[in-house]
Amino acid sequence: MTRVVLSVGSNLGDRLARLRSVADGLGDALIAASPIYEADPWGGVEQGQFLNAVLIADDPTCEPREWLRRAQEFERAAGRVRGQRWGPRNLDVDLIACYQTSATEALVEVTARENHLTLPHPLAHLRAFVLIPWIAVDPTAQLTVAGCPRPVTRLLAELEPADRDSVRLFRPSFDLNSRHPVSRAPES
């Protein structure tokens, strides 16, 4: 089994529908969805505000490369064209972390540094728009940074207050449909 933590964001068109398309596309693999947050753009490019959320999914058939392929397919289906770095996005789907079940059934974080796949996401620990929704859906989450697992709550506390304040609750529940209850927390 592999579990994935996905960060989804959109600042063009029907932002909420774009986020919903990913949750719908995950189907029964979706096990948890954060509330939706509105966030100032990150990276210094002038543009509209983003809607962001974190989705957690499990699928025994997906290896990390397959999760990447699925994320890119969600983006293509939304009409995403890769252009300006950190520019406006119809839809952005980032793999933040992947976990595989060990022989003892514990979840083990996957690390990868290969063509177009870096896990965990190398900038996730610097992005309040990733950390805040992730904590909302999994308060005990950890992320490996510089080779050491760190509580996501600690990573968020280390960010500047202005970064944390740039992320505001937009909708308290993801409210996608009745198939995906928000309250179902991931198992660890």
UniProtKB/Swiss-Prot annotation:
EC number(s) stated in the UniProt entry for this protein: 2.7.6.3
Keyword tags: ATP-binding, Folate biosynthesis, Kinase, Nucleotide-binding, Transferase
InterPro entries given in the database record: Hppk, Hppk_sf
GO molecular function: 2-amino-4-hydroxy-6-hydroxymethyldihydropteridine diphosphokinase activity; ATP binding; kinase activity
CDD domains to which the protein is assigned, alphabetical: HPPK
Enzyme class, first EC level, given as a word: transferase
Pathway(s) where this gene product acts: Cofactor biosynthesis; tetrahydrofolate biosynthesis; 2-amino-4-hydroxy-6-hydroxymethyl-7,8-dihydropteridine diphosphate from 7,8-dihydroneopterin triphosphate: step 4/4
Catalysed reactions, as listed in the record: 6-hydroxymethyl-7,8-dihydropterin + ATP = (7,8-dihydropterin-6-yl)methyl diphosphate + AMP + H(+)
GO biological process: folic acid biosynthetic process; tetrahydrofolate biosynthetic process
Function: Catalyzes the transfer of pyrophosphate from adenosine triphosphate (ATP) to 6-hydroxymethyl-7,8-dihydropterin, an enzymatic step in folate biosynthesis pathway.
Family: Belongs to the HPPK family.
Protein's recorded name: 2-amino-4-hydroxy-6-hydroxymethyldihydropteridine pyrophosphokinase
Species annotation: Mycobacterium bovis (strain ATCC BAA-935 / AF2122/97)
Lineage, uppermost ranks: Bacteria, Bacillati, Actinomycetota, Actinomycetes, Mycobacteriales
The gene coding this protein: folK
